[in-house]
Amino acid sequence: MRSFVTNNDIPVGYVTPKFPSLYWPINNSKYNTAFLYYISDIWKFSLYWTLIFNGAFYVTAGVYASLTHRKKAGSVWIFVMYVLYGGVQGLTTGTVMGFLIGAIYRSGLFSMSTWVPLCCAVVQILFDVVLSYSMVGSVM
């Protein structure tokens, strides 16, 4: 008897889905699910999504900060520092988040949809947006 989607039920011949592998199950005639079973795959997907969202957020913030300081001498360095900080933060938070949610799903013996790392990366970048406001950052 097959149990609900557990780690013990990894399909024979399972191949890790390609990177985004996001599927939309509603009104899809070719309903093709994509699940992650191994912690290394969960880590990779989490890291990629976090780097994508952090890159977009910090490049945009760096361009805006550089444009507001364009008449001063160090405006290019502002952009470089934003991008560097976004990359380092994306690498660390993506790694921690990937291994953490991978361990949680593994301990529950569940497989993970490819949407979960995307949603975790969105939550992480929204947390950065909330902390970017000075009043909220000083309260926390």
From Swiss-Prot:
GO cellular component: endoplasmic reticulum membrane
Transmembrane segments: 45-65, 76-96, 116-136
Localization of this protein: Membrane
Biological processes annotated in GO: cellular response to hydrostatic pressure
Bilayer topology: Multi-pass membrane protein
Pfam families assigned: Tmemb_170
Source taxon at top rank: Eukaryota
Chain positions carrying an annotated carbohydrate: N27
Keywords: Glycoprotein, Membrane, Transmembrane, Transmembrane helix
Family: Belongs to the TMEM170 family.
Matching PANTHER family: SD17342P
Protein's name in the database: Uncharacterized protein YPR153W
Originating species: Saccharomyces cerevisiae (strain ATCC 204508 / S288c)
Lineage, opening ranks: Eukaryota, Fungi, Dikarya, Ascomycota, Saccharomycotina
